[in-house]
Amino acid sequence: MKNLKINNRFTAELPADPDLTNETRQVKNTAFSYVNPTKPSNPKLIHASEETAALVGISKEEIHSEEFLNVFSGKEILPETQPYAMCYAGHQFGNWAGQLGDGRAINLTEVENNNTFYTLQLKGAGKTPYSRTADGLAVLRSSIREYLCAEAMYHLGVPTTRSLSLILSGDQVLRDILYNGNPAYEKGAVVCRVAPSFIRFGSFEMLAARNELKNLKQFVEYTIKHYFPEITGEPKEQYLQFFKKVADTTREMILHWQRVGFVHGVMNTDNMSVHGITIDYGPYGWLENYDPNWTPNTTDSQNKRYRFGNQPQVAHWNLYQLANAIYPLINETEGLEKILESFMDDFILDYKEMFLNKLGLFTSTETDNDLIDNLEAVLQLTETDMTIFFRNLSSVKKTDSVEKAIEKIQFAFYKIEEVSGEILDAWKKWFSVYLDRLNAEVLSDEVRLQKMNLINPKYVLRNYMAQLAIDAADKEDYSLVNELYTLLQKPYDEQPEYQKWFAKRPDWATSKVGCSMLSCSS
C-alpha cells in the first residue's frame, strides 16, 4: 500500500502512557496506550469496501494483496506506525462508569488523502490495557453487523464511521450471546473502521473527572486545531465555538436517525463522537412497526432509556456531560447553558421540517403539528411498518380518494385484518386531512414523488436481513453479505432485482435472537 500517507500526529502531540505492558489497569495522565494487535491464526478476507479504500488512498488491486490482509487483520503493523488504544471514560445508561477506553479497538494510524485525515481502527484485534475482564476480540456475528451497517448508514446520508474491511481471524472466540450463562464458541473476525478520528465525549470526561486539567486543555486544543480549524478567537471563545459545533453536528446526526428509523441502542457518552457521526454499531436496529418506545437492546429492555423516541433527549443529556467536562476550561456556565438550551428548541423545529418533508410537504401551516402528532398516533394503532409506509406514501396522488390512498399504503400493515372499525376510521380521518394538505402544495405528484423518494429509503438493514447474512456466513457462504452490501449502496433506488428485500419483518424473526433481541455481546 505504497500510496498511504501515514501521519502520527495523535501520538506525537498528545501524552502517551509510559507503561508499555499490555495489562488491564487504570491509566492516568495520558490520552492513549501503545499496544499491538493480537495476531490472528489464519486470516481470510470476507469483504472490503472499494469506496472506503479509495477514500484513504488504497487501490482496488491493493485490497486483494497479502499486505492488505495482514495489516487489517492485525497480523502485521504498517511501517512507521505505532498502534494504540485510546483512554476515555463515560456515562453508561445514565451512570458514571469511570475509565472505559478502547477495550477491543486498536487504532493503527492516521492517513492523509486529498487533504483529509482519516483514522484507521481495528475492532476485535485483541486485548488492550482497557479491556477489563474481556479478551478484546470480536465475533463474526457482530462484525458483519458493524461492517454492513456503517456502509448502509453512509449511503442513507447519515453521518457515520465507514467500514474498510471484514476479515475472518481463523480463531474461535467464547461468547455468551444473551448473558444467560450459556457461553459458546463462535468464529472470530476483525473489522477495520474509518473516521476523521475516534475522539469521544468520554475522552474529555475522563480527564475532567481526574482533574487532569493540563491534559484536558491540551486535548481540547488539539481537537480544535486539527478538526475545527475554522474556529478562532480567544481560548474561552474557542471552547464555546467547539461545543456549539459538536452540539450542532450531534443534532443533525440524531435528526437523520429519526428520519430513517434508526435506533442506536447504546447511546452512552463513550459512544458519542465529537464529529457528530454514528460510531459503535452494537445492538442497533431499525424500527419495523412504528413504535417510539422500541429499543433493540435487551440490556435496556426494562428502562428503555435508549428507545427510538428518546434519542434526542439522550443526545441532549450527553451534551450536558460534555459541557461539564470542558467547563473547567471556561469557568463560566452562561455560554454553555445557552447552547444547551437552544439544542432542543432547534431540534424540534428541524424535526418538524424533516417530518413534513417525509410526508411530501415542503411548505408550513399552523395545523402541521397536529398532522404530525395524529400520524404518529395512528401509526401505532396497529403494527405499521415505518419504512414501507413512508416509501409507499409517495405514490399517493392529490386526486386519490381516502380509500385509494389507504390501499396504496396497506402493504405496511402487519395485520391487515386489524384495520377496520375504529382503526380504519382513524386512518380515514388522517388521510382526509393529509389529502387536503397535499392539495395546498404547489408541487406536482411526479415531482413530489421524486423528492419523497430521496428522503424515505426503500431499503434499510433490517435485523432479520443481517441475521440471514450471519447465518449463511457461519457456513462459509458470504453471498448474502455481498448482496446486502450491494443493495444498501443505493437505498433510495427502486432496484427491482432486489424487490424481495422490500418486505416487512417475517414472522420467524419476531422471536429470533439477533432479529428481535440483541445484546452488547460481540
Curated annotation (Swiss-Prot):
The reaction(s) this protein catalyses: L-seryl-[protein] + ATP = 3-O-(5'-adenylyl)-L-seryl-[protein] + diphosphate; L-threonyl-[protein] + ATP = 3-O-(5'-adenylyl)-L-threonyl-[protein] + diphosphate; L-tyrosyl-[protein] + ATP = O-(5'-adenylyl)-L-tyrosyl-[protein] + diphosphate; L-histidyl-[protein] + UTP = N(tele)-(5'-uridylyl)-L-histidyl-[protein] + diphosphate
Superkingdom of source: Bacteria
Signal peptide start-end: none
InterPro entries from the UniProt entry: SelO
Protein name as catalogued: Protein nucleotidyltransferase YdiU
Keyword Amino-acid biosynthesis: no
Binding site for ATP: G101, G103, R104, K123, D135, G136, R193, R200, D280
Species: Flavobacterium johnsoniae (strain ATCC 17061 / DSM 2064 / JCM 8514 / BCRC 14874 / CCUG 350202 / NBRC 14942 / NCIMB 11054 / UW101) (Cytophaga johnsonae)
